[in-house]
């Protein structure tokens, strides 16, 4: 079966402490949002210490058109993905021409030609590499990208795939949107990029086998999360039902994933999840009947980087893989939720 070999990350160039983000929100929302101070504790309740963003904080104080923001996305995503790929290929002793497939995941910017085409030129990847851009899966995109690569490589065991994800959530900020959803996004979201190497059975690469994958689109949930496309750009959509959906569906989804691999919850060593936020991790813990400490890798990445949408779970995997060697036994569940409303999951052999 295909294996996850390595994950490398690239950080956005600017750091913003959570206290500074809260001060920014007070200045930006203060005159337009009644009873703003009642909502401000959400900045501390997230547990986030700092985040990385693509532009200096002062840039976000004024409105920018979709064209300007999208150009900034393309530039940042291309540069950061290239940096992450160079790190990964050097660490694994691989040449760019050793890569046969390229997957590019994002939801926060638009590009035609797609970013993967730009990366072939920047990195010197094969011009015959098969390219698969994946857009619109939001926070679930990182897991979906890994799962798609793994399924494709089942029939191509001698091939290697790079799965890129790059999200510049901060660039979607609308300075004149004073909704609660935009305030919540200001407290949670950040920017980052990552790349994973997934290899077929016959490459000789040694990593963590991807044993099975699962996708689920929940009924009557299209309005739970996503974008509203407005003249000024992408306007964030959130619904308070997310913890309720987790409570209703998460346990059954976990059991279905495990059953496909012939194992049970007792066989799970690690939960490597997209953190989303504290309420999301708590809802998972309640649904599974476990402590939130089981999500420590996710919680720590969220503390240090915030929610980078599809990229976040790859940061979680990068930390875990750098601290462990393959083959010590056990299983890790990797999962994320995204627009649709949907769930993506995969099972790693450890």
What are these regions (language model features)?
Residues 1-75, 175-248, 252, 337, ...:
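Condensing-enzyme catalytic core mediating Claisen C-C bond formation in acyl metabolism
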Residues 111-118, 163-184, 212-231, 277-286, ...:
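Active-site-adjacent elements of ketosynthase-type condensing enzymes
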Residues 44, 76-91, 115, 193, ...:
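Short, well-ordered amphipathic alpha-helical segments that serve as non-catalytic structural scaffolds
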Residues 46-127, 131-136, 265-281:
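Conserved beta-ketoacyl condensing-enzyme motif
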Residues 6-8, 105, 135, 161-167, ...:
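Short beta-strand segments
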């Amino acid at each position: 079966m295909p294996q996850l070999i390595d994950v490398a990350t690239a950080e956005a160039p600017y750091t913003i402490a959570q206290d500074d983000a809260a001060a920014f929100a007070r200045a930006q929302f203060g005159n337009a949002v009644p009873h703003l101070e009642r909502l401000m504790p959400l900045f501390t309740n997230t547990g986030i210490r700092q985040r990385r963003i693509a532009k200096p904080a002062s840039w976000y104080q004024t409105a920018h058109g979709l064209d300007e923001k999208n150009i900034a996305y393309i530039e940042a995503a291309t540069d950061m993905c290239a940096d992450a790929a160079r790190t990964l290929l050097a660490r694994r002793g691989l040449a760019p021409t050793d890569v046969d497939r390229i997957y590019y995941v994002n939801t926060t910017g638009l590009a035609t030609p797609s970013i993967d085409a730009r990366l072939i030129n920047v990195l010197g990847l094969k011009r015959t590499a098969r390219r698969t851009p994946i857009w619109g899966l939001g926070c679930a995109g990182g897991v979906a990208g890994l799962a798609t690569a793994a399924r494709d490589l089942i029939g191509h065991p001698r091939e290697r795939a790079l799965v890129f994800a790059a999200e510049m959530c901060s660039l979607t900020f609308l300075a004149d949107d004073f909704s609660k959803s935009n305030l919540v996004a200001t407290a949670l979201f950040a920017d980052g990029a990552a790349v994973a190497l997934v290899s077929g059975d016959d490459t000789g690469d040694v990593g963590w086998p991807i044993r099975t994958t699962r996708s689920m689109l929940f009924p009557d949930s299209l309005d739970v999360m996503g974008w509203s496309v407005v003249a000024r750009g992408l306007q964030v959509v959130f619904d308070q039902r997310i913890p309720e959906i987790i409570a209703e569906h998460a346990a059954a989804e976990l059991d279905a994933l495990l059953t496909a691999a012939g194992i049970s919850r007792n066989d799970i060593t690690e939960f490597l999840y997209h953190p989303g936020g504290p309420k999301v991790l708590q809802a998972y813990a309640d649904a599974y009947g476990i402590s939130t400490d089981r999500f420590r890798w996710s919680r720590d990445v969220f503390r240090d980087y915030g929610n980078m949408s599809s990229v976040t779970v790859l940061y979680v995997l990068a930390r875990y893989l750098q601290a462990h060697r393959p083959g010590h036994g056990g299983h890790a569940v990797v999962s994320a939720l995204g627009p649709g409303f949907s769930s993506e999951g995969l099972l790693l052999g450890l």
